[in-house]
Amino acid sequence: MDYQTFEKVNKFINVKAYIFFLTQELKQQYKLSLKELLILAYFYYKNEHSISLKEIIGDILYKQSDVVKNIKSLSKKGFINKSRNEADERRIFVSVTPIQRKKIACVINELDKIIKGFNKERDYIKYQWAPKYSKEFFILFMNIMYSKDFLKYRFNLTFLDLSILYVISSRKNEILNLKDLFESIRFMYPQIVRSVNRLNNKGMLIKERSLADERIVLIKINKIQYNTIKSIFTDTSKILKPRKFFF
């Protein structure tokens, strides 16, 4: 497999892991979800008083129901205001007052500090892709979400599926077991088992019991499966390039 293709997929996996662990850190600091923080960052960096709901949905690229749900939550928490256009009640606008803007700025400034501390503590500062502040983080986050959607709709694969295929293909001459995957992938054991079963049913890997000990599940791939994985990685690597969003 082409080295650059393999490295791009590896970077994608590392970035997704970074976002997962930073999100866990943020949950301890805020009573806000990552999607709520994204909307606050949207208003902070757009620096506009009032924006239509339609424009927000188009910029953030989330499902309308998700955006509406999080805007409603932020409105209840006093971060933003939601109103209908007097001339056309079907049009919804979201606005922030000067006081709310200061409140949002405090959240974003604190988020910048958390990201900086997290990178230093987890030694992420050595990676060029690691975001230095919230704007870079949300650009990274939205790119990852775009890539995950690509995997889902193009190949019917989850991020965990891709991670397992990466580990197996990087050690294609070995016969691995579930423990090997658990030690290599930052997911819970039951999740890995379900993903392996799904990939086995799709014919993308071979799962079998060890003859020496039937409690041990062995995992391997053949040449045809390796070529299929190679093709998936090649297509995935082509869309793993930074995209411009609303920032």
UniProtKB/Swiss-Prot annotation:
Keywords: Activator, Cytoplasm, DNA-binding, Repeat, Transcription, Transcription regulation, Virulence. One of its GO terms (biological process) is response to stress. GO terms for cellular component: cytoplasm. The keyword Cytoplasm applies. The keyword Flavoprotein does not apply. Transmembrane segments: none annotated. Residues 53-76, 178-201 bind DNA. It holds the Pfam family Staph_reg_Sar_Rot. Its main location: cytoplasm. Gene3D superfamilies: Winged helix-like DNA-binding domain superfamily/Winged helix DNA-binding domain. GO terms for molecular function: DNA binding; DNA-binding transcription factor activity. PANTHER family: ORGANIC HYDROPEROXIDE RESISTANCE TRANSCRIPTIONAL REGULATOR, TRANSCRIPTIONAL REGULATOR, MARR FAMILY. Belongs to the SarA family. This is HTH-type transcriptional regulator SarU. It comes from Staphylococcus aureus (strain COL). The lineage of its organism: Bacteria, Bacillati, Bacillota, Bacilli, Bacillales. The gene is sarU.
